[in-house]
Amino acid sequence: MSRICELTGKGRQVGHNVSHANNKTKRTFLPNLQNVTLISDSLGKGVKLRVSTHGLRSVEHVGGLDNWLLKTSDDLLSLRARRLKRDIAKKQQAVAA
């Protein structure tokens, strides 16, 4: 399972541990990923995603999963999230028509 947020695209970063003597050793910084079930208002069901805590706060700030997906560009989203975005857009167009 990859260590990448499905909504924001945040992945691991590489840096150094720096000792008191300024010795540097390589290390990785992993995103704080959580397995969560987010509710889609348009689809009326829950969707299981692997999301970073930063992404979770962003989704809540925008007003829910549907708003987040429709406002976010496709290049940041995972394949599952892009499919979900397409389904939500279709459902909203059907309701509007």
From Swiss-Prot:
Any keyword Glycosyltransferase?
no
**Gene Ontology biological process terms in this record:** translation
* One GO cellular component term noted in the UniProt record for this chain: cytosolic large ribosomal subunit
Signal sequence, renumbered to the chain: none
InterPro entries per the record? Answer: Ribosomal_bL28, Ribosomal_bL28/bL31-like_sf, Ribosomal_bL28_bact-type, Ribosomal_bL28_sf
- Specify one Pfam family: Ribosomal_L28
* UniProt keyword terms in alphabetical order: Ribonucleoprotein, Ribosomal protein
Could you tell me which cysteines form disulfide bridges?
Answer: none
Q: Which Gene3D superfamilies does this UniProt record tie to the protein?
A: Ribosomal protein L28/L24
Molecular function GO labels? structural constituent of ribosome
Instruction: Identify its protein family.
Output: Belongs to the bacterial ribosomal protein bL28 family.
- State the protein's name: Large ribosomal subunit protein bL28
